[in-house]
Regions:
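Short Gly/Thr/Asp-enriched flexible loops that form oxyanion-binding sites at enzyme active sites
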Residues: 126-129
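Short, glycine/serine-rich, charged loops/turns that create anion-binding
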Residues: 11-12, 55, 94, 122-124
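Internal catalytic-core helix/loop-beta-alpha segment
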Residues: 72-73, 79-123
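Active-site acidic carboxylates
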Residues: 1-89
Length: 129
């Protein structure tokens, strides 16, 4: 039991200037709030799960978007501001954190009372998760 915090796509490829799908300077303004959410959940002993964009070079998503967040590259890593926090990391290949991942099983195992979801690109990956 307990609660779960899902942190979606707070990765270098979206959050650091100079990358193909950088979400812009305004996106960085959410970092302190995300950190506070993580700290609050960890203080209460809740689970924190980081869901991170991580693609293969031939991913179908690249038919719609420029190549980004390739598996094993810096772009697919959590931003430095979040790397010191404990939590499980789930790489994803599509908008939804549930597509071909074990997120559903993890949530079933935890059986949370409440799931809080946060992250960048709320109109795409956060919404689809």
């Amino acid at each position: 039991m307990g609660n779960v915090l899902l942190v979606v796509d707070m990765v270098v490829g979206f959050m650091v200037e100079g990358h193909n799908l950088y979400c812009g300077d305004e996106s960085r303004s959410i970092i302190p709030n995300i950190c506070s959410l993580i700290e609050d959940h960890q203080f209460r002993g809740d689970s924190v799960i980081f869901i991170c964009d991580s693609h293969e070079p031939n991913d179908l998503e690249f038919e719609m978007f420029p190549v980004h967040c390739l598996k094993g590259t810096e772009e697919s890593l959590l931003i430095p501001e979040l790397r010191s926090y404990e939590g499980e990391l789930i790489p994803k290949r599509r908008y939804s954190g549930f597509f071909e991942t074990d997120l559903d099983q993890k949530l079933t195992d935890i059986s949370p009372d409440l799931i809080t979801i946060c992250g960048v690109c709320t109109d795409i990956c956060v919404m689809h998760t």
